[in-house]
Amino acid sequence: MIETQRLLLREYTPDDFDALYEIMSDAETMQHYPAPFDEARTRRWIEWNLENYAQYGFGLWAVVLKETGEFIGDCGITIQNIDGEMLPEIGYHIHKKYWRRGFAKEAARAVRDWAFQNTDYDIIYSYMKYTNVGSYSTAIANGMKKVKEYPDPKNTISYAYAITRKEWEELCDAEA
């Protein structure tokens, strides 16, 4: 489990389905995906993350408010195809009623720190559809820089942002 000032990030359980489905089936939340998720796709999402935990020791984690225990989204690290390479990527989905409160930034920063502290990766990515300003603003706020713009069959054009271990260490030193 990862803990931040306001959030807990924990492994998914099947009990998270209803709260996750509310997020993933919402057209506004999923506007940067080809389509919102149906029930089957949402169940598969949870199963995929349970498989990732078993295979890699990480995946997307449920994001819950510390104060209330309410499920507000997910955030974590998965292995994603970024312009033909399988790379470690921080992703996040936050319920729209919690947008613009810094929750994605807080969760993604905690995942970034966890990844550099608990894996051997020398670079961590986030990728998103070019129209997803909120997502790349979160990446920039967490020290990532745009490293690639590429055609992506899922997204028309995708942007990839990244931070290296060295850049992360320098950020940590500056914040200390």
Report each predicted region and the residues it spans:
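Acyl-donor (CoA/ACP) binding surface of acyl/acetyltransferases
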Residues: 1-31, 64-176
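Conserved GNAT-fold acetyl-CoA-binding loop/helix
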Residues: 28-48, 59
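Short loop/turn motifs at secondary-structure junctions and domain boundaries
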Residues: 52-56
